[in-house]
């Protein structure tokens, strides 16, 4: 497994804990709003900063897609 995939799984698990939902629900939401590949491809940015910044970014991206 490559480092991007490992980090993506870690990010999904931590984001699910943060939102108090299942990782399946997180992935389904990302898929619903066509964000899965975008988030996956943000490895270079997300793995270098505080994970809370990634959470905020994901929240903002989902909210933007909802509106």
Predicted features, each with a name:
Residues 14-15, 30, 64:
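Low-complexity, intrinsically disordered/propeptide-like segments
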Residues 6, 24, 33, 49-56:
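Generic alpha-helical secondary structure signal
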Residues 44-67:
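Long, compositionally biased
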Residues 1-25:
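N-terminal acidic leader/helix
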Residues 1-7, 40-51:
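Charged, low-complexity, helix/coiled-coil-prone segments
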